[in-house]
Amino acid sequence: MFTVNNVRASSEEDLYAHLMAQLDRMLHFGTTVAEVKSGYGLDLESEVKMLRVIRRAELSHEITVVANYLPAHSVVPGHTAASMAQDIVTRQIPAIKALKDQGVINPLLIDVFCEKGIFEVEETRAILEAGRSIGLRPNLHIEELKHLGSGVMAAEQQALGVSHLEHLDTEGIAALAQAGTVGIALPSTQYLLHLPPAPVRQMIDSGMPVALASDYNPNAPCLSLPLIMHLGCVNLGLTMAEALVACTLNAAASLGKSETYGSIEVGKAGDLVLVKAPSWEHLIYQMGDAPIDVVVKAGRVAATPRH
């Protein structure tokens, strides 16, 4: 609860300044579209505060910000998982809808930390269904610490993306591949928590698109997608080409943004990263010192990290 208590005690201005500083750093690492989650308020007032901050960043920062509402990140003192899920479904989500309709906040996604002993499958399903009823699309944590069989449920809920996945099984992979859900591996978290690798090769071989993400949070404070791609190759067994697609087109698809972002095509946003190196592979190969020369956002130079 350390981070939750600090978020609850922080002013909106402090949170906004912190978020904008992190987005600035992400831009210099080549990120032009970022999912930003709530999830460290865990009561309605504090979650709304976080979502207001994310909305302000969406309107003011050069990075395209996609807000993910994460009301069920942990069970807070005074609640059981069941009572917290009930409160989220009956009280919090209707309030989120009202504020979204007013334009005060703009979450597009909904997330639950679906894990044994925290929010299990039925509680997660109820929260996702309530979120979907107000137009939020599921993009959630599953199968990180223990196998729970949540992959099939996520597929049934038409999740855009599912993340962590270290204990995802064959049945879950098949269901998610059939649903077109993107599997989001988080190699920095896997590395720092000494978790088994997500079964990305089996996912790819089964036709399930794989994305990579930083999972930037207090337990995995990494903002560098070039480093994430490096870890994806070394620790998860991706090829460099697979890692690049995972951090671009498939990542955009996990946010419902692949029609506009994620590849260089006529009609898409002009977001580019120019690398000063003999070949693009040096973006991944040069561990911790990616040779990013220019970051272009919507056809305009947004950052020049090496100048």
Identify the function of each model-found stretch.
Residues 137-138, 147-260, 275-277, 287-289, ...:
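Active-site-adjacent C-terminal substructures of enzyme catalytic domains
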Residues 36, 140, 212-214, 270:
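Active-site flanking residues adjacent to catalytic metal/cofactor-binding acidic residues
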Residues 295:
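Short aromatic-centered micro-motifs
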Residues 3-18, 24, 32-148:
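Metal-coordinating catalytic core of metallo-dependent amide/deamination hydrolases
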